[in-house]
Curated annotation (Swiss-Prot):
SUPFAM superfamilies listed in its UniProt record: Ribosomal protein S5 domain 2-like
UniProt protein name: Ribonuclease P protein component
Organism name: Bifidobacterium adolescentis (strain ATCC 15703 / DSM 20083 / NCTC 11814 / E194a)
Gene: rnpA
GO molecular function, one term: tRNA binding
GO BP terms: tRNA 5'-leader removal
Family annotation (Pfam families): Ribonuclease_P
Keyword Hydrolase: yes
GO cellular component, one term: ribonuclease P complex
Length: 121
């Protein structure tokens, strides 16, 4: 799984306003066939970006949340459609959530994305 790196890619995903939300996680998604113009249309495979704001906590806390999200995204990436961009956004409560809870939420979100995009493939 590749990473979303550029601001343009993040904005493209967030602009589409397609998302799935749980207690501590919001998953924004964009199918590559949704993109009309831009560099994103030429990319194949899944790409994931992380958005953890200062509202989540200090730098140490934010980095811990990002590490957890990366591990969980790798674990459940097979649930996602082949050609999509995902932005995982942490809600402030994610800092206090235990790993098992985050794992269940991530699996649930990725399943929901898969269901919502199944008709498009």
């Amino acid at each position: 799984m590749e990473r979303l790196k550029s601001h343009r890619d993040f904005v493209a995903v967030l602009k589409r306003r397609r998302r799935v939300s749980r207690e501590d996680i919001v998953v924004h998604y964009l199918m590559h066939d949704d993109v009309v113009t831009g560099d994103t249309a030429t990319v194949q495979g899944r790409r994931v970006g992380l958005a953890v704001s200062k509202a989540v906590g200090n730098a140490v806390t934010r980095n811990a949340v990002k590490r957890r999200f990366r591990v969980l995204a790798r674990k459940y990436e097979s649930l996602l459609p082949e050609s999509c961009d995902i932005v995982l956004r942490a809600k402030p409560s994610a800092a206090r959530a235990d790993f098992l809870s985050l794992e269940q939420q991530m699996a649930s979100c990725f399943e929901a994305v898969k269901r919502k995009t199944a008709s498009r493939q």
